């Protein structure tokens, strides 16, 4: 007959701590894998009009780049993508397709886990 030993409090705390650590690492991995990207297109000067959303859609579609949305904003367009790779590809395509006079920039999402990690890394920590 086999007698089962009851786990000690120390073993239980190690098990709980390890489970929490694995859960946090899994959450971080998922968050990094699902990184959205936003591309902003703005005219350089006052005399240049905002690019047409349909023409932007046409250039992206012709190059096989999928996007989530195109939104007009005050002085430009915001285009959302599922990944940073799609955003970088769109920046390259639109840089060639649009006439000179536009600033095309990838924006970092302030709520993304990588943005939070970079803030923690770059912020000075004072201990003691």
UniProtKB/Swiss-Prot annotation:
Q: What membrane topology is given?
A: Single-pass membrane protein
- Key word Repressor present in the record? no
For this protein, the parts annotated as crossing the membrane are 12-32
What is its subcellular localisation?
Cell inner membrane
Q: Which domain of life is it from?
A: Bacteria
List the molecular function annotations (GO) for this entry: protein kinase binding
Q: Which residues lie on this side of the membrane: Cytoplasmic?
A: 1-11
Q: Which UniProt keywords apply?
A: Cell inner membrane, Cell membrane, Membrane, Transmembrane, Transmembrane helix
Which Gene3D superfamilies does the entry mention? 3.30.70.260
| Entry's Gene Ontology cellular component terms | plasma membrane
* Topology feature Periplasmic, residues: 33-128
Which Pfam family, any one of them, does this sequence belong to?
SecD-TM1
**Subunit-structure text:** Interacts with EnvZ.
What family does the entry list?
Belongs to the MzrA family.
Which HAMAP family does this one have?
Modulator_MzrA
- What the protein does? Modulates the activity of the EnvZ/OmpR two-component regulatory system, probably by directly modulating EnvZ enzymatic activity and increasing stability of phosphorylated OmpR.
Q: What is this protein called?
A: Modulator protein MzrA
Q: Which organism is it from?
A: Klebsiella pneumoniae subsp. pneumoniae (strain ATCC 700721 / MGH 78578)
